[in-house]
UniProtKB/Swiss-Prot annotation:
The gene is SHO1. The chain crosses the membrane at residues 33-53, 66-86, 94-114, 123-143. Forms homooligomers. Interacts (via the SH3 domain) with PBS2. Interacts with FUS1, STE11, STE50 and RNA polymerase II. It comes from the Eukaryota. It comes from Saccharomyces cerevisiae (strain JAY291) (Baker's yeast). This is High osmolarity signaling protein SHO1. It is found in: Cell membrane; Bud; Bud neck; Cell projection.
Length: 367
């Protein structure tokens, strides 16, 4: 059996929520922004169509193209309601934004023709199209922005379903993860966690690493499986690995002197790394799934975090775990952009730090 087959655990298919796009009016009622904006749009449309019909029924001249703009606006309002009821707003954001932009041009053009016309009936029609233009501009700002934008997050914070997940932020996350993983295997995320926990943090992935103010643990299991198996490793990386090995050996010797009960643990640390970091037959204690975290005790998960958004683990990365929105997770390491965490069902792995928020007490779990 090759070393890589020992080190790499078999990827597990993450559990994903079933996406239900059936017609549900509660999807529309649960969003205060949708209810308020669409209700105002309907009222404005009624004012515009009423003023237009009254003005056209008299001998006053009425711009004919305004009729198409009013009908087009009605189609936009109906489409928005359907997208919300079927929970398809995020799937058609580009279409919604561009179609509303066209309606904005139609309404502003009609307002230009009606606002300077004489007669109270045309004044009512002009007031309706002006209100529709304002609402369309607000819609363009909202639907044209990503869910991670400040305005969208503030608006979605009033929704019963909470803040919507950002497809852009999620795709950038995974693209960065794949790019880092293809550069040097195990130099990112889990491997950096092992280096950081040993007190020797370096900049491997192009992003500045912070020195931790505390050490949660130095476990032989956490360091298992990260021996250097790359024949073309650069001298700089070898220097870091040698320094890390010396620190681990020093810690092992100190433990042997002070506590004889840890002899087995120190033996595992010595056997995990090859002395010259060659590609020889190096034994590893990596488990079949996430052995990296299998021996971490409950005492090491000293933090609690609340999931701000749902997250689906990457199929290509067996170390990531999925979680639901508002789920409470136990966290053992809060340094860097990826944290070690444990779910309530005992599943352990790494999670993106910007998808969760640390909580101090039980009262914050229900916010």
């Amino acid at each position: 059996m090759s070393i890589s087959s020992k080190i790499r655990p078999t990827p597990r298919k993450p559990s994903r929520m079933a996406t239900d796009h059936s017609f549900k009016m509660k999807n529309f009622y649960a969003d205060p922004f949708a209810i308020s904006s669409i209700s105002l749009a309907i009222v404005s449309w009624v004012i515009a169509i009423g003023g237009s019909i009254s003005s056209a029924s008299t001998n006053e001249s009425f711009p004919r193209f305004t009729w198409w703009g009013i009908v087009y606006q009605f189609l936009i309002i109906c489409s928005l309601m359907l997208f919300y009821c079927f929970d398809l707003v995020d799937h058609y954001r580009i279409f919604i934004t561009t179609s509303i932009a066209v309606a904005f041009v139609y309404n502003t053009n009609s307002a230009t023709n009606l606002v300077y016309a004489d007669g109270p009936k045309k004044a009512a029609a002009s007031a309706g199209v002006i209100l529709l233009s304002i609402i369309n501009l607000i819609w363009i700002l909202y639907y044209g922005g990503d869910n991670a934008s400040p305005t969208n997050r503030w608006i979605d914070s009033f929704s019963i379903k909470g803040i919507r997940p950002s497809p852009l932020e999620n795709s950038l996350h995974r693209a960065r993860r794949r790019g880092n993983r293809n550069t040097t295997p195990y130099q990112n995320n889990v491997y950096n966690d092992a280096i950081r926990d040993s007190g020797y943090a370096t900049q491997f992935d192009g992003y500045p690493q912070q020195q931790p103010s505390h050490k949660n643990y130095v476990s032989s299991t956490a360091l298992a499986g990260f021996e250097n198996t790359q024949p073309n490793t650069s001298e700089a990386v070898n220097l870091h690995l040698n320094t890390l090995q010396q620190r681990i050996n020093s810690a092992s010797n100190a433990k042997e002197t002070n506590d004889n009960s840890n002899n087995q643990t120190n033996t595992n640390i010595g056997n995990t790394f090859d002395t010259d970091f060659s590609n020889g037959n190096t034994e590893t204690t990596m488990g079949d799934t996430l052995g990296l975290y299998s021996d971490i005790g409950d005492d090491n998960f000293i933090y609690k975090a609340k999931a701000l958004y749902p997250y689906d683990a990457d199929d290509d990365d067996a170390y990531e775990i999925s979680f639901e929105q508002n789920e409470i997770l136990q966290v053992s390491d809060i340094e860097g952009r990826w944290w070690k965490a444990r779910r309530a069902n005992g599943e352990t792995g790494i999670i993106p730090s910007n998808y969760v928020q640390l909580i101090d007490g039980p009262e914050e779990m229900h916010r």
